[in-house]
Amino acid sequence: MKLLILIFLTNFIYAQSSKESVITVYKDGTALVKQQIVWNTVSKGESTLDYDDIPKSIHKDTPFISIENAQVLSQKFVEKVFSSDEYFLSKKGTPITVKLKNEKAVSGSLLEISSKRITIQSKYSVRSFNRDNIEYIETKDNLSNPNFSPYLSWEVKNNRAGKLKANLVYKLSNISWDAIYRLTTNGQTKGELVVEAVISNNSNKDYLDARINLVEGEINNIKTEQMNNYSKLSMSRSVAPQSASTELGDYHIYSAGGVKNFTSKENITVGIYGPLNVNYEKIYVFENFERQQKDEPLKVEYTLSNTEKDGLGIVLPAGKVDIYTSSNKGGFEFIGSDKMGQIPKGESSKIQAGYAFDIIGKRKVLNYDRQRKSEEAVIEIVISNTKSEPSPIKIVEHINGDWVIKEQSHDYIKEDASTIHFIIDVEPGKKEYITYTYRKEWK
């Protein structure tokens, strides 16, 4: 079905060009854009300036502008765009022409229009038509300057005729970034770490000749409605030089210096740090709760310490860690991934790679005695190491309430009011037995 409307355009002063932009990207899916724009020919005195090269996901309450040699009198954000449905709804009671498929056109006064039917009153009758059978609807109106996309408009007063340069600032959704770590392990203590940033432009706008900054840290935002959902993005990788973090008040900021063009539906990967030779602690963890009985492989856990002596001592953003291990053939294989929070200098983070095939933990409750005001349990834990090398083991036990430990076979460390752990080494091809009794009392 065609919609025939006669449209005449009059002159408005639209921006002739958009220059360099600076984009600050946050991890909550928003970004701040600082855009240079130019109007080449503007008359002296009061003028109306329009700019329509804006993304659909712009936060409409955020734009503000500064213009050289001009005073901004007012600003408006125009969202209304031409819609044939809205247009014809506004034409109820006025003459229209409906052309049916394989039939002559019918003219009359529009009574009703919906997604399924159109009803008109002709000279002698009222007729209702199925929209699927209509070839086109026609009105003889002349539309002056219909809007096809949202735009910003300013009333300005400038001191002289000629070119006007401006700096426009606004926020938008659907642009985000995240950190990706690639840790390649080589044995129990040493490996290589690469830190990259993946920047996603999920908006509908291309940013050309752009400088991109990445902010690490959680900012407070009033949630706004996401205006669009988009399909899968394309991927590209930049070989940009490494970027050091600088402070931005209470946050940290990284420069994605290798990015120039940031086009819609695109992911760009840029380097932040690395490759770095790092030290880590690898340990196998067996974690349990009170009367729980288990027989399962142990969790493989790596601890990264953000210190200079361990090859770091830098600001590490939160992100995903992909873990690889060196193979006997000189390559490497993927062995797991985990999420990691921000690691300030001097702090550490634990990363889980998966579960070990050759190290098994078995936990039994050998005896349990509950009285009216107390309970007591005897616990046995067996760790079997079928690997060809010694393995460090951490056994974590969670016990709630008012408890004491007695008759333990190994020394333990109390972590907090409900957690203890044992640290042991199990020789290759051996088993290690750990036993203890916990007693709880209450009034």
Where are the language model's segments positioned?
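Long, intrinsically disordered, low-complexity accessory segments associated with secretion
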Residues: 3, 14-443
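N-terminal signal peptide c-region/cleavage motif recognized by signal peptidases
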Residues: 10-12
